[in-house]
């Protein structure tokens, strides 16, 4: 289903309600540059580095795209997805069933998720929706819940410190979205709806967040404009 949510005037802040869920795959595919490419890259990296029968959890799994990509490469992995939206989880279960993938799904707040003896934790464009005062605590709980040698994979929309450069990058991104079929009105509507809901950090702030939780090193494996994917190793 095509994303046309913001063709009409917005009446509330952005949230992952049933309407958003119904168009989510199209929305993220057209809104996040090279979403499919970066997702496949992460899956290939994890498929190479994870031990046999590794446990992987995706916090904010949405419609399970990342988990399904990983399952296609490594069917020995024990996969789990958590999302606060019951509609997202319902969609994820349907997709997993269609692919014949054995994935455990649950509805829940990622801040309250039990992370224990995991080999990998994924958060794809989810951390940016967590209020800043709670992010450090969440990343620390992820670190604590990973096995030694485990990896935390997180993709984030980022901001730049230099205001002029940041403005240029936003304009480039909005031009990109227009080429994906969104009107300038839709782009402006979504930007307004996301204000104070999606709160991005700089690249350095994201690295500091992970290192401060205890991770020994942080690598970046993908970047396009305001979008990055990090791997933090325990």
Swiss-Prot record:
SUPFAM superfamilies: S-adenosyl-L-methionine-dependent methyltransferases. Homodimer. Keywords: S-adenosyl-L-methionine, Transferase. NCBIfam families: carboxy-S-adenosyl-L-methionine synthase CmoA (TIGR00740). This is Carboxy-S-adenosyl-L-methionine synthase. Catalyzes the conversion of S-adenosyl-L-methionine (SAM) to carboxy-S-adenosyl-L-methionine (Cx-SAM). Belongs to the class I-like SAM-binding methyltransferase superfamily. Cx-SAM synthase family. One of its GO terms (molecular function) is carboxyl- or carbamoyltransferase activity. The gene is cmoA. GO terms for biological process: tRNA wobble uridine modification. It comes from Campylobacter curvus (strain 525.92). Pfam families: Methyltransf_25. Transmembrane segments: none annotated. Its EC number is 2.1.3.-. S-adenosyl-L-methionine binds at residues 35, 60-62, 109-110, 124, 191.
């Amino acid at each position: 289903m095509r994303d046309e949510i913001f063709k009409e005037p917005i009446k509330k802040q952005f949230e992952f309600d049933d309407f958003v869920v119904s168009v989510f795959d199209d929305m993220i595919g057209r809104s996040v540059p090279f979403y499919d490419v970066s997702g496949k890259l992460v899956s290939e990296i994890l498929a190479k580095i994870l031990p046999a029968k590794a446990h992987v959890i995706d916090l904010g799994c949405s419609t399970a795209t990342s988990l399904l990509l990983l399952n296609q490469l490594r069917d020995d992995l024990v996969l789990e997805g958590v999302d606060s939206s019951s509609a997202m989880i319902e969609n994820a279960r349907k997709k997993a069933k269609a692919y014949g993938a054995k994935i455990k799904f649950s509805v829940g707040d990622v801040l309250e998720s039990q992370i224990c003896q995991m080999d990998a934790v994924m958060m794809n464009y989810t951390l940016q929706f967590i209020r800043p005062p709670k992010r450090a605590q969440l990343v620390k709980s992820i670190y604590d819940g990973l096995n030694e040698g485990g990896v935390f994979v997180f993709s984030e929309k980022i901001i730049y410190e230099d205001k002029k450069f940041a403005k240029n990058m936003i304009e480039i991104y909005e031009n990109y979205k227009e080429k994906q079929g969104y009107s300038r009105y839709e782009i402006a509507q979504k930007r307004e709806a996301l204000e104070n809901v999606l709160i991005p950090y700089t690249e350095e702030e994201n690295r500091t967040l992970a290192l401060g939780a205890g991770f020994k090193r942080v690598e970046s494996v993908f970047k396009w404009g305001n979008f990055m994917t990090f791997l933090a190793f325990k």
